[in-house]
Amino acid sequence: SERLAAGAEALVGFLDAGQGIEEQGIAAPQEEVEDWLRGRSWALSDADLAGGLEEEIARLASSAARSLARAHVDRARADAALLPETAFLAALSETGPDPLALAERFGATPLQAMRRLAGIPAVQAGLVTCDGSGTLTFRKPATGFPLPRFGSACPLWPLYAALGRPMQAFEARVQMAGQSDRRHRVVAWAETRHPQGLRGPELREAAMLILPDDGAGPVTRIGSSCRVCARGDCPARREPSILAAEGS
């Protein structure tokens, strides 16, 4: 139909806007780092971290990406020191992918446990993190849970509920728009820190772990971002979608 064709044309244009940047060789530093991690199946083993990854990092195209990659590796190395791989996998077999239970067992934070879980291929977990502005600072997708590459994410994500209420766990079963046969369980958590002390600014970081879920029962209907979400009855929509509404 003409409506379907127009929607497809709009979607292609929307995606091409990002592809054009990549073709010019100026992909965002965050995307460079995520592409590097994707090539490693998102896994940095304790052996990798101990052996050093500088040779791989040096091959990234931009200095900004190399800086982000080094910061990511430093953080992963600190996580591994507190949550060593062998002991963490043994604990995981007992608790399941519960970041709060794992954090309690190792004296770590839930954010550290989430990052470790996301780096274990067998868990099949996605992970997103954001800063206090809500901007996504890390994006590891999960099957059937597409993440926005540009712009803001869905305001209904529990990630943002957690951002507004640090140190409180949020768990939900969700269904992504366009994924009627797939559901996920998400766990979100936020923390604050004061790197400049009492009189400095409070910084917030939130994370949302995305886990496969095969259970039945009610779900929260969410999307990726408004522009590419076809849910026509969403109360949180901030801008029109370029796709035809579901059921139309």
Predicted regions and their residues:
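Conserved binding/catalytic microenvironments
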Residues: 1-248
